[in-house]
Structures are given as structure tokens and as C-alpha cells.
């Protein structure tokens, strides 16, 4: 992984990151036998999984001459947040996060949920909001489930569950992993 300590966050150049990801994917495709070990590694290393493979979407980037889809590269505080959430989950501890704007908390939670869904059998991750459209509105990038579906769509096929098909496994308010039984579900306060 590129050295994020020297990455220019104010004027990002994602080309080296995309090149590194492409090279990683080419190595994986040249030697598919490494996939089980890679998945075993990522099952215990969510920060590395996010930094190595996941992307985010921000249409405001276009105004700055940056692609709307960019590699998801975690700031140090974001990496600490991921580790905090995973530690609470593993320890079966309650926790609370006060969500601020434009710090990526929604995308972080989407990334963590995606990681759990991919690598931990039988997990059920829930997302909720006071309105259903904030949780899942097909085609709306503001909804959490759009972000999850887009995250999955941007992953290499090798990292997706065997047999996964968005139409069959990601209907409204639910995303099912056909390989390991994990599910991401949505709830809303709408009556």
C-alpha cells in the first residue's frame, strides 16, 4: 500500500493508487491460489481491506477536477474509528458515535458493514434512519444502501461472494451474502 503519511490530501493524485490496485488485481488473477490466504488476512485486517480495495463516491469532486469515484483511503482518525468499531463488535460492547458532516462516517460504516458481510459468516448488520429513503432508495447516492451496492459493484469479482447477483441478493432494505449467509438489513421509522 502507498505511504498514506505522505499522501497529499488537499490535492490528491489517485493515479499511483489506481496503478497499485491494478497491479494487485493482476497478481491475484495470475495466481488465484493466493485468494484464500488474502481473504483470511483481510478477515482480520479491515483497515487494510478498505485501503487496498474499497472506493467512495463524491459528486462534489468533479468541481475540483477529481473523479467522483476515488479509492477509499483512510485518514488516521478514520482508521482508528474502524479499529474502534471492530473492537466494540468483537467485544460485544455497546458504543455511540456522534456523526458530523463531511467526515465520512456514513462511508466508514458502509465499509465496515461490507467487510463484515464479506468475511464473517452469519453476521447481520443493521442500518436505520427516521425515513426509509435515507436508508434505501434505489438509484439515490444519498441513501446508505446505494453506497453499499456501489461499494460492492466497484469490488473485483474475485472478492465478491460466489453466486452474488445484485438483482437477486440486494432487494430493497436487504443485502444477502449467498456464500456465507451474512445480511445487511435496513430499518426506518416510517409508518
Which positions does each model-derived feature cover?
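Phosphate/NTP-binding elements of NTP-utilizing enzymes
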Residues: 2-191
